[in-house]
């Protein structure tokens, strides 16, 4: 379904529009750079979609199973992704100064606070059922920053973006386990086991931040295998998402008007709101761009895993991840064109 020819044919004119706008940009260097970025983003999203399509087909054919997906997810989250983030911290270009790093981390925390407010407003406006409200809010709050955000940001800003996005893990897991788990469980935050915050990605992010601030570099003997292992993350994650989406009933997701409104909020309202608010006091275009780009990401696939773990509406969570992921192929380049 994901790889159906009409879907790709419909996207190709949009891609070539981005390329053609670049060609007529003229002598204005800033405008020309912006249009190049749009073309790169369209191309990157098509590449990611192709990878997801392979995973989707593998899931439909039984090559990738639920048990296999679980093992692949553990491998990515505990091995390949930490390697990629750590390599970016100690081997990438040092474009961000120490002040920029601390500011960006603070912006991510502020971004989550803003998304929590937007999610609560959506919950009140849509009159959600009590048992499903937590799932809807989580879909609105938490972006797929690692699996989709990193490759897209790297396509625009280069390898520096990988380290920049890795800083999001700090507020991500703090917000997830201090607020998200209590939200989906329906219990006060004080009853949540905060030890869960210290996941491999969280620990790697803290270590990477410390190494970056101390300007510590690794020898090639360690850096090269770390980079190679980290490169498994993007194709592995895209195939994992595609395989997971193979079990989601698309028709049911499309017919859920509340989910459609939430998808519009997640993919359109969120990046616009973040950009408008933060542009008032953030003057660095790269920092503002990274925060805006993260806000434009689809819902985190982790939400469906969390719903399953706490025996909530797992199907609803999967529908939200499916719908936002598919539509983000169009909305992410659109938001890039309009906001960055």
Go through the PLM ranges and name each one.
Residues 14-15, 19-340:
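Alpha-helical transmembrane segments of multi-pass small-molecule/ion transporters
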